């Protein structure tokens, strides 16, 4: 099956690591395994079948915890969609499923490097994100 889109570029649009002070770092270092990874995907048309797809990862503690660090990345993919794609569902699948599945290994590597370089080495995400499954759940 041929793909009905092509990723013509990827870049880090925004990346953030926030640990406000030393007591917070010491607290977070012991609690970071309880942090949750959240994902958000949004897109916008650029021009002539080109779409900007932003995949956002946020790694943080529960809102009520006062001593916490926050990590976030917005990874942008520039996608050229085949002109034959006119169905809204097909476009949605490209944006929410196909592109994220393709770029996720690089995005995860970059994000884990951010965590390591921020003083929190050895973090691993328990399971790989299955964007196909998330897309199917969303459709139901």
UniProtKB/Swiss-Prot annotation:
Compartments where found: Cytoplasm
Origin superkingdom: Bacteria
GO molecular function terms noted in the UniProt entry: unfolded protein binding
Biological process annotations from GO: protein tetramerization; protein transport
Main subcellular localisation: cytoplasm
Pfam families in alphabetical order: SecB
Keywords: Chaperone, Cytoplasm, Protein transport, Translocation, Transport
GO cellular component entries: cytoplasm
Gene3D superfamilies associated with the record: SecB-like
Cited SUPFAM superfamilies: SecB-like
The family this protein is said to belong to: Belongs to the SecB family.
Function: One of the proteins required for the normal export of preproteins out of the cell cytoplasm. It is a molecular chaperone that binds to a subset of precursor proteins, maintaining them in a translocation-competent state. It also specifically binds to its receptor SecA.
Description of how the protein assembles with itself and partners: Homotetramer, a dimer of dimers. One homotetramer interacts with 1 SecA dimer.
Protein name per its UniProtKB record: Putative protein-export protein SecB
Organism: Pelagibacter ubique (strain HTCC1062)
Gene behind the chain: secB
